[in-house]
């Protein structure tokens, strides 16, 4: 089954022809594996409609050489250990971005555009904050041909760095790899800085572990990575309060968590690598767009394109006239 476009919701749903193929295959075969050779996340709610579908494999677009690895996974020669980098919802329209699906042009111009009205609430940041019940397969989800036990040794901070240490043991019958994921939840006040309910902070993958083998992995990140951007302050802000750091198998499945308190509010006005001052960029192109907000989700939920061209956008891609004088070099000349 092949599609080359994703400009509308229908392009991410099964066609009648695809549904007919699935009906036939699942009726004639007792064990079916669905392989998704796709770049975007199609609608997958139909996987639960067929009792004979045993598994689904998300392979992206691996090309001809990559398909050899897919065959090895299907044959059991290689144990899959990938994790979803997207949230798979039951329906396409469950994604706020679907309100802006399409190929839009500003009136009277050839300029195309897409409006990201969902603000920071993209993917799991939206679903885990507002609509967890609409998720079929959560961010970070993935299965293996074996089982792993986790023993969380510590979740700690020295005020500058946050570190989690986890011992992973293969307690199954096949060799395999596992992925330890670490998330954080920052203190939030309604009407304050925009923050999602949970954010990925880091992850680590084990080596290939034989049955019974163990490995201790460490995931660490800067405490300042938990800051939120304040557009009015033009700075990154760490608000005072408890920061919850959790070790998880995916964004939904927590194994252990720790509260890390911050006594005083911190404002980060300079880049910690370059020392350059932090400031807003491109604020003049926002126009009249209403951005999705945690403080009032019903009133700010994306409704579709505004189709108004601001002067800032109109002139954004205009090439400035050269200000220097000189002679244009001769092209195609032959020199002896």
Where are these regions (language model features)?
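Beta-sandwich strand segments
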Residues: 251-259
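A short helix->loop->beta-strand "cap" motif at the edges of active sites that frequently abuts
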Residues: 27-32, 51-54
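Conserved small/polar residues in nucleotide/adenosyl-binding loops
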Residues: 1-2
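Short, hydrophobic/aromatic beta-strand segments
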Residues: 175-182, 229-232, 257
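Short, surface-exposed ligand- or partner-binding patches at beta-edge/loop junctions that are enriched
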Residues: 220-251
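Short acidic, flexible loop segments centered on an aromatic residue
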Residues: 173-198
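Intrinsically disordered, low-complexity Pro/Gly/Ser/Thr-rich segments with frequent PxxP/GP/PP motifs
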Residues: 190-231
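Secreted, periplasmic, or luminal enzymes acting at the cell surface/secretory milieu
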Residues: 37, 42-177, 240-248, 261, ...
